[in-house]
Amino acid sequence: MPNPPRTAAIIVAAGRGLRAGAGGPKQYRTLAGRPVIARALQPFCTHPEVFAVQPVTNPDDTAIFNDAVTGLNFRPAVGGGATRQGSVRAGLEALAELNPDIVLIHDAARPFVTPDLISRAIVAAGQTGAALPVVAINDTVKQINAEGCVEATPDRARLRIAQTPQAFRFDVILDAHRRAARDGRDDFTDDAAIAEWAGLTVSTFEGDAANMKLTTPDDFIREESRLTALLGDIRTGTGYDVHAFGDGDHVWLCGLKVPHNRGFLAHSDGDVGLHALVDAILGALADGDIGSHFPPTDPQWKGAASDKFLKYAVERVAARGGRIANLEVTMICERPKIGPLREAMRARIAEITGLPVSRIAVKATTSERLGFTGREEGIAATASATIRLPWGAEGLAG
């Protein structure tokens, strides 16, 4: 085996996760503002020793999967099977053309895997060919019978809780999965059990107590509180934008195409509301302004839709491990009237940012017929953004 070995990863995300509640697969729920599946994928996608990441998903989830993992680099997802075992086999078969030396198999419902744990998995598989991370059991364990009565008290010193990523030589675990399928065995709950059944010696290495699997609603409540408490660097930014009227029959405001007797004079679509929000978010990040990221001298932004700019700003927050707590924009104009459009604007901003509409405010005022807005020569907008970042997240994402 080469050193370092060619390592690929399979992220199993085809389950329905109904025990977690919320009416949908748990891997697509957000945790501290970010989808669980994105949290699980990113450490593998960015690990320097992992050259290929293969997601396995339910084909019915294609749209929500694509929305959840924007910006991550991985192989096209393949459809899973009727069981976790079948889904892993589908991922292994998809990787067969690459023939990696080692494969890491990880559950998407474990979003707290660390680069260090991934590195330990690669080393362990290189040494023994089959290995899984484990953590000790601190509580006394009881074995009970069908009536709920205690039958035995196992020695907890020899018991461990299994985690993922489980790591294997690719050829041996692929062969074990194929043999199990031929023999009609589809009842294994993890890949180490298949390796054991196939006669392989499975070693263990130190896991991580924080690398827990999200299963129940209480798991989400607890981890949401823990992650939010870590985001103690609370920042506020402000933004301002203005555009003059020119010829046209509509204006773009807060992501909506609004009929009007004038248009905007602008390099992009001139959406003053979204531009002000972008500057507010970038200001909270101390990350320049909209002009430094999208220069008006660059022809690629000519006529560009401003929702692209706002999505980019939101991604900058996520790249720093943060979340947006609140967005507020105030439109300053005589016409068009903002009141009838307010709720549609809030909904559109929520759609662009992925935030609940309850965290978005759209307000309107006039300048009492004073100044350029009072003379109906253009529209102005002010905005504020409150974000939460983890302490020590000063470095900008590339």
From Swiss-Prot:
- Which PROSITE patterns does this UniProt record tie to the protein? ISPD, ISPF
Gene3D superfamilies linked = 2-C-methyl-D-erythritol 2,4-cyclodiphosphate synthase, Spore Coat Polysaccharide Biosynthesis Protein SpsA, Chain A
Per the record, the domain of life is Bacteria
Q: Residues at site: Transition state stabilizer?
A: R19, K26, H267, T366
- Which residue stretches belong to region 2-C-methyl-D-erythritol 2,4-cyclodiphosphate synthase? 235-398
Binding positions (a divalent metal cation): D241, H243, H275
* Region entry 2-C-methyl-D-erythritol 4-phosphate cytidylyltransferase, spans: 1-234
What biological function has been recorded for the protein in this entry? Bifunctional enzyme that catalyzes the formation of 4-diphosphocytidyl-2-C-methyl-D-erythritol from CTP and 2-C-methyl-D-erythritol 4-phosphate (MEP) (IspD), and catalyzes the conversion of 4-diphosphocytidyl-2-C-methyl-D-erythritol 2-phosphate (CDP-ME2P) to 2-C-methyl-D-erythritol 2,4-cyclodiphosphate (ME-CPP) with a corresponding release of cytidine 5-monophosphate (CMP) (IspF).
Name recorded for this polypeptide: Bifunctional enzyme IspD/IspF
- Per the UniProt entry, what species is this protein from, by scientific name? Rhodopseudomonas palustris (strain BisB5)
Q: Gene name?
A: ispDF
